[in-house]
């Protein structure tokens, strides 16, 4: 058995599969592009569909099963089968390396619940001081190249383009599909997602789905990690301004509290003047360079936002007269 790279449906594709009209999505895209809020009824529709997406995810077999039955027991069975497939794959490696790959894969959900979500090498085989990140490079590459996991590289001193200053040894790993994550975390308790249970912190779930959306739209994934200033969930290249766009993800009511992001924006050396905070709240507004947007607007974030098709046409160079 071999795992081919799985391309799951992103949230926009999921909406279309659920019967949402393309014109409705395009209307929301127009609002996103113009920093506008959508109306209350459409907001409620998108938010409810988004919560369902957190449960079902975008793997085609799981989506098809949900459309057929609306039965999360059947969907969870599909997701469990995929978990098991991931665990028994990596057949090209010897048994020891297969076990390491499986261990790293199984660590991802618990890592995401930690305050510092990055991979800590000594926890992989409980061999403190004996192994370095480079010792597991092949295992990490397998998980990311096969599409089983998404790697988000740390940046401590952001510069455009981000790839020039990324850390090769400090990474966070996310599961490739948010439905797989909620299957592990909540099983059949769908109300943990659908009813906003106060006792449940959905931070890791929201981060996971945003990582998935950013990746699906061609963004290279990075996050900000600085000992003095703190951590910001995501950084992406903003090609329209040749700058860096920080993105913070909030699942709770305190979405306007983001001290690390504030410190990030107040650092003159970074020359970054705008940021996005994603949350459950409908209203789009900009305060001190930070634009607050509803979480489902993540389906529109692309580093090429602001660059039109006309901007990519290079005119012919006229031949000079001699």
Q: Model segments located where?
A:
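Short glycine-/polar-rich loops that comprise or flank the Walker A/P-loop
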Residues: 1-2, 219, 271-274
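Interdomain motor-coupling "hinge/lid" segment immediately C-terminal to the ATP-binding subdomain
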Residues: 1-113
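Conserved nucleotide-binding/hydrolysis micro-motifs of P-loop NTPases
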Residues: 8-13, 156, 180-181, 254, ...
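Accessory nucleic acid-recognition modules appended to NTPase machines
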Residues: 63-239
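Nucleic-acid nuclease catalytic cores
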Residues: 226, 270-290
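Active-site ExK catalytic segment of metal-dependent nucleases
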Residues: 244-253
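Active-site-adjacent loop/helix micro-motif of nuclease/hydrolase catalytic cores
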Residues: 253-263
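Domain-level recognition of nuclease-like catalytic cores that cleave nucleotide substrates
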Residues: 281-322
């Amino acid at each position: 058995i071999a795992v081919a790279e799985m391309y799951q449906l992103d949230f926009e594709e999921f909406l279309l599969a659920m019967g949402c009209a393309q014109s409705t999505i395009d209307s929301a895209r127009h609002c996103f592009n113009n920093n506008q809020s959508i109306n209350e009824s459409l907001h409620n529709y998108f938010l409810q569909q988004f919560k369902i997406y957190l449960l079902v995810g975008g793997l085609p077999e799981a989506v098809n099963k949900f459309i057929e039955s609306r039965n999360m027991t059947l969907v969870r069975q599909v997701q469990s089968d995929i978990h098991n497939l991931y665990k028994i794959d990596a057949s090209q490696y010897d048994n020891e390396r297969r076990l390491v790959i499986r261990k790293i894969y199984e660590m991802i959900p618990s890592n995401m619940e930690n305050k510092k979500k990055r991979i800590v090498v000594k926890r992989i085989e409980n061999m403190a001081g004996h192994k370095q990140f480079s010792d597991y490079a092949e295992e990490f590459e397998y998980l990311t190249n096969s599409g089983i996991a998404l790697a988000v590289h740390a940046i401590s001193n952001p510069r455009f383009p981000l790839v020039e200053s990324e850390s090769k040894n400090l990474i966070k790993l996310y599961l490739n599909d948010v439905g797989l994550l909620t299957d592990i975390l909540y099983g059949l308790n769908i109300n943990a997602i659908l009813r906003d249970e106060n006792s449940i912190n959905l931070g890791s779930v929201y981060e996971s789905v945003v990582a998935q959306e950013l990746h699906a739209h061609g963004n290279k994934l990075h996050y900000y990690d600085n000992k003095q200033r703190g951590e910001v969930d995501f950084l992406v290249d903003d090609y329209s301004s040749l700058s860096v766009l920080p993105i913070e993800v909030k699942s709770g009511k305190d979405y306007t509290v983001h001290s690390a992001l504030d410190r990030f924006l107040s650092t003159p050396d970074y020359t970054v003047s705008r940021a996005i905070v994603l949350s459950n709240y409908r209203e789009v507004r900009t305060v001190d360079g930070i634009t607050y947007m509803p979480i489902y607007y993540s389906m529109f974030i692309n580093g090429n936002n602001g660059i039109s098709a006309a901007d990519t046409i290079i005119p012919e160079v006229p031949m000079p007269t001699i």
